[in-house]
Amino acid sequence: PVAASNAAPIAPAPGPLANNPMAKKTKRVVIRKINNAIDAAVPGSDIYIASWNMRNTGAVKALLRAQKRGVRVLLLMAKENSSTGRQKGKRTTNKYCTTLSRGLAKGNRFVAPERRSGTKLCAHSCRGTTGIAHTKFYLFSQAGTATNVVMYGSSNLTDLAATNQWNDIFTVVGNAEMYAFMVDAFNQMWADVPQPAPYMSGTFANMQ
């Protein structure tokens, strides 16, 4: 069953945005914009997230709420960040990713296979045999009244990205060609299979 939508009917604003970790009012503007877009995702839409790391309680809760509304949520993270190190000789896990993964799996019980949500860890650059998956982007098929939303920038989905780092994000809305290109990139990363070319590039018209 799909819960009634409580998504905010506000479209993510296009354009650049940067945080200042030294300023109380602006240090969380990037993370807040991402989480607000998650909350604005409409039932039946898709969210694709590629983040080198994910450690933000607000994001976990927002993504689980989105799934309950009938949104398909897919989150890809670098394999090396599934662990937070070792304590007293024991490996400690990334509790944020674990909570999200388990929550999404539970929410999939009554969902058709093609609409199931999930998380995945990829090795190296996801598309290659070396490097790390350091790209960060957030895709929404529809958030509020905005369709084909692409958010790309330097910010991981972590508290540290807001409180200890300067980060930026650029949002493009309504560009179906760019959105499809980024979904294709995400799908290649999700497959975690080395690709012939080390990177992807594209040219897009009508950017907003």
Residue ranges and their predicted role:
Residues 1-43, 53-208:
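HKD-type phospholipase D/PLD-like phosphodiesterase module
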